[in-house]
């Protein structure tokens, strides 16, 4: 596989090499990083370091990923909350903690596996063998509505709506702190964080990202917010809320690192989905209720 090149800075000085790699490379654990060093798949300034090497800053690291084991998306009988289904599309309410499609870090137990069990062969092949039917994604620790296509025509029709921003997606979240205004728009470009490849960040020259938001309710130290995506970048709402200085409650990547008791993920739920049906051309508007964890947190912060 092609090596990944990383450049360290003074801020990395004193950090163990394996810890730096695990922080910087998506889906790489610290133990896997240490093994890569032992296997000779990591070079620092062109030389093989020992596994306890500590960075001094301003090094160039070359990391060669291990060849991944083949992944085969297989049907698995996992509970599926179907909100809408016909011959062309299926919309489900994804729980927090469920990954959308197989990848090296999670080869099974995903939404794709359960869709294959539920739908059989009637999923579009446009997304490839590991993403059959998947038109868009939501993060593992985000819950709510996600649509999948049952044939290639439906997939292409829905993808076109996604591209021209007519497939409307609405989210609700709880953010830390009190937003000054009652509504607003964040128009700030997003790209991968150069310091940590697992994170996204607002970066000049990144891909355009637009989030419209409005306050639903205010609580001491928290705000219940509705967000509408105009674009759909990776981690967009999470990045934009943190950019405003109000990270989403429970988001350990862009907010406080400590998990919130009672939450399995962040308080972010895809509550609404609106699209033109690929076959009938009718407008379909769907909603789903907030998960129990979310409503329990609203009660808790209202005390």
How does the language model describe each region?
Residues 44-45, 101-102, 149, 200-202, ...:
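Thr-Gly-centered strand-to-loop micro-motif
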Residues 249-262:
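Short, surface-exposed loop/helix-turn segments at secondary-structure junctions
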Residues 1-185, 189-194, 293-301:
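RNA pseudouridine synthases
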Residues 50-54, 226, 265:
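Short, surface-exposed secondary-structure edge patches
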Residues 46, 65, 239, 257-258:
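Conserved "cap/hinge" positions at secondary-structure junctions
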